[in-house]
């Protein structure tokens, strides 16, 4: 019979571990906002206690808005996962952004619309190498409009998988969202489900997959970034 005993865990240690597993971490882009809100809260509280309460609520909201939940991507080969949390707005054939150099042949485009209440980080849809990253200035139309894909400010990224399959993911600014963050660079090796960017305050993300791919979602369906399988990819 084994006489080994499991190490004891103090209630405080258990509580800290539970909080770490329950409360999602915050994306680095949100730290200046949270810090600014916290400082403002402390200053205002000295003048009026009620302002301190409101400031505390604002600080908590900023931290919640920039949350970056832990996600586990499917391990299947030959699939593309959702690049963002949100609602599928469109599934259609469309020519990818010209700046990616993919030519004029249509690909299948799946558009995911994010409201202000959704998680606003973007996830890598396919493991592989980043072969192109291109930013283009544009308008700030409402992200749920069809022409937002063509007219709005955007940041496009092209990824080539190990088998040569290429997918593109495009961050699109919206009526309120006017700040696109992309941490990926050309030549980077990226993993499906990992965070690569963020769009502030409501936006849209377009995923382009090979035209003959089998799309597994439909308009109106909710997606979970890094986990929902968007399509089974046609081989290169």
Swiss-Prot record:
The keyword Translocase does not apply. It is a peripheral membrane protein. GO terms for biological process: phosphatidylethanolamine biosynthetic process. It holds the Pfam family PS_Dcarbxylase. The modification Pyruvic acid (Ser) is found at residue 203. GO terms for molecular function: phosphatidylserine decarboxylase activity. Keywords: Cell membrane, Decarboxylase, Lipid biosynthesis, Lipid metabolism, Lyase, Membrane, Phospholipid biosynthesis, Phospholipid metabolism, Pyruvate, Zymogen. It catalyses: a 1,2-diacyl-sn-glycero-3-phospho-L-serine + H(+) = a 1,2-diacyl-sn-glycero-3-phosphoethanolamine + CO2. Binds 1 pyruvoyl group covalently per subunit. The record marks 202-203 as: Cleavage (non-hydrolytic). The keyword Hydrolase does not apply. It is an enzyme of class 4 (lyase). Pathway: Phospholipid metabolism; phosphatidylethanolamine biosynthesis; phosphatidylethanolamine from CDP-diacylglycerol: step 2/2. Its EC number is 4.1.1.65. Its cofactor is pyruvate. Is synthesized initially as an inactive proenzyme. Formation of the active enzyme involves a self-maturation process in which the active site pyruvoyl group is generated from an internal serine residue via an autocatalytic post-translational modification. Two non-identical subunits are generated from the proenzyme in this reaction, and the pyruvate is formed at the N-terminus of the alpha chain, which is derived from the carboxyl end of the proenzyme. It comes from the Bacteria. The active site is at 203 (schiff-base intermediate with substrate). It is found in: Cell membrane. Heterodimer of a large membrane-associated beta subunit and a small pyruvoyl-containing alpha subunit. Catalyzes the formation of phosphatidylethanolamine (PtdEtn) from phosphatidylserine (PtdSer). NCBIfam families: PRK05305.1-2 (NF003678), PRK05305.1-3 (NF003679), PRK05305.2-5 (NF003685). Belongs to the phosphatidylserine decarboxylase family. PSD-A subfamily. This is Phosphatidylserine decarboxylase proenzyme. It comes from Saccharopolyspora erythraea (strain ATCC 11635 / DSM 40517 / JCM 4748 / NBRC 13426 / NCIMB 8594 / NRRL 2338). The lineage of its organism: Bacteria, Bacillati, Actinomycetota, Actinomycetes, Pseudonocardiales. The gene is psd.
């Amino acid at each position: 019979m084994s006489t080994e005993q499991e190490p004891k865990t103090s209630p405080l240690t258990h509580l800290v571990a539970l909080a770490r597993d329950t409360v999602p971490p915050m994306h680095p882009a949100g730290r200046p906002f949270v810090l600014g809100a916290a400082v403002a809260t402390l200053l205002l509280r000295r003048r009026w206690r009620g302002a301190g309460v409101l400031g505390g609520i604002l600080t908590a909201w900023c931290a919640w808005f920039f949350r970056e939940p832990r996600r586990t991507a499917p391990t299947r080969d030959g699939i593309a996962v959702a690049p963002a949390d949100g609602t599928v707005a469109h599934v259609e054939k469309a020519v990818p952004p010209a700046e990616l150099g993919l030519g004029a042949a249509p690909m299948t485009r799946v558009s995911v619309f994010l409201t202000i209440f959704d998680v606003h980080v973007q996830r890598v849809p396919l493991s592989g190498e980043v072969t192109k990253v291109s930013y283009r200035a544009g308008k700030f139309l409402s992200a749920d409009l069809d022409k937002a894909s063509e007219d709005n400010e955007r940041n496009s990224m092209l990824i080539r998988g190990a088998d040569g399959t290429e997918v593109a993911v495009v961050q699109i600014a919206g009526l309120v969202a006017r700040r696109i963050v992309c941490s990926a660079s050309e030549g980077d090796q990226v993993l499906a489900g990992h965070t690569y960017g963020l769009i502030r305050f409501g936006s849209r993300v377009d995923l382009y997959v090979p035209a003959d791919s089998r799309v597994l979602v439909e308009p109106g369906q909710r997606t979970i970034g890094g986990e929902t399988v968007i399509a089974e990819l046609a081989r290169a």
